[in-house]
A protein has these predicted regions:
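Nucleotide-activated donor-binding/catalytic signature segment of Leloir-type glycosyltransferases, i.e.
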Residues: 175-194
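Membrane-proximal helix-turn-helix segments that form the acceptor-binding/catalytic region
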Residues: 45-46, 71-89
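Short alpha-helical donor nucleotide-sugar binding micro-motif in glycosyltransferases
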Residues: 83, 193-194, 201-206
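Conserved acidic donor-binding segment of nucleotide-sugar-dependent glycosyltransferases
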Residues: 246, 250-257, 266-272
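Carbohydrate-associated surface elements
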Residues: 95, 115
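Aromatic "clamp/platform" in nucleotide-sugar-dependent glycosyltransferases that forms part
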Residues: 214
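Short hydrophobic beta-strand element within catalytic cores of glycosyltransferases
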Residues: 231-234, 251
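Conserved donor-binding/catalytic core segment of Leloir-type glycosyltransferases
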Residues: 125-152, 165
């Protein structure tokens, strides 16, 4: 509690100093209601400045352990109040917004997806001819990296010149499990945690992103892969169906390793049907900073206009 109070005091001081120096802003944009929304409430009460809120946090389900329902009374009370007093609610997916409305309370919303740095993630023609799958995540259990490894092991029993790149593991658990599967030399590489720029470079050298999660909201990694022109194999969960379609993805059910192996076969056998340049072009038109920025500016204008009525 002491740390929370210190955090609030520091931010309140910073906000006061900002207003003294620059004057009052017309609008405050809160990202993730708790804890930033507490400051939004304080600013609204003390300075009469309205705020809107964008929610990214995928806790409004019963699949993750640390979900909204499991949280304490204070968390729920403040979250509900933050949404109620917001002048507008933006969600990164329709799936997430419906979860908020189901558990927190009814609130009209706009869907604006997560953005992608298209200066890093863009189409680049592959320099190598070898076929390559790529997986990028923190590899916590809900990402089901072990299921990817088992499915890929079955896949390479029929295909030789195919590689799987795993990016983002923080420890030895997944690597040790991979060793137990006894992959052929050159079939599997772990790159660990690497700089963001290198993630983009590795995607540009790959042929397909694999995401086999048990639960997701609106994963940034899919937008990043699409902006590089990569088709995607992904589970049909959460907000993912809002990001992909048949022109750029194969969707399967979570935990279905047989379907994942089959999707790998389907992807490699039909890889030439995917127009990577068009995938990238469409994705940049959906996720780039400029596109998302324009959508947010429209919402700002609508909120400010409604307050003048």
């Amino acid at each position: 509690m002491t740390n929370q109070l210190r955090w609030l005091a520091l931010y309140k001081k910073a906000i006061r100093n900002y207003i003294i120096k620059n004057g009052k802003p017309d609008l405050v944009h809160v990202h993730v209601p708790f804890k930033a929304g507490i400051l939004g409430l304080w600013i609204k009460r003390n300075y009469k400045i309205p705020y809107l809120v964008t929610e990214h946090w995928g806790i409004y389900n019963n699949l993750i352990e640390d979900n909204y329902v499991s949280r304490g009374i204070a968390f729920k009370r403040y979250t509900k109040k933050i949404f109620q007093q917001a002048s507008q609610f933006i969600s990164v997916s329709d799936y997430l917004a419906k979860g908020v409305n189901r558990l927190v309370g009814k609130k009209e919303y706009e869907v604006i997806p997560n953005t992608v740095n298209t200066d890093l993630f863009f189409y680049k023609e592959k320099e190598n001819s070898s076929l390559r799958f790529i997986h990028v995540s923190n590899m916590v259990p809900l990402k089901n990296a072990e299921g990817i490894l088992r499915s890929f092991k079955k896949f390479i029993q029929q295909y030789g010149n195919v590689e799987l790149i795993m990016i983002g593991d923080k420890g030895s658990v997944i690597r040790n499990y991979a060793k137990s599967l006894d992959f052929p030399i050159g079939a599997l590489r772990f790159l660990g945690e690497i700089p963001y720029t290198q993630v983009a470079a590795e995607m540009q050298k790959a042929d397909c992103l694999i995401l086999f999660s048990d639960i997701e909201n609106s994963p940034c990694v899919i937008g990043e892969a699409l902006c590089c022109g990569l088709p995607v194999i992904t589970t049909n969960i959460g907000g993912i169906p809002e990001l992909v379609d048949q022109s750029n993805a194969i969707m399967i059910e979570p935990k279905d390793e047989e379907s994942l192996t089959q999707a790998m076969h389907e992807m490699i056998e039909g890889i030439n049907k995917y127009d990577r340049k068009k995938i990238a072009e469409n994705a940049i038109g959906k996720f780039s900073y400029s596109v998302i920025g324009k959508q947010i500016n429209v919402v700002y204008g609508e909120v400010l206009a409604s307050l003048k009525q």
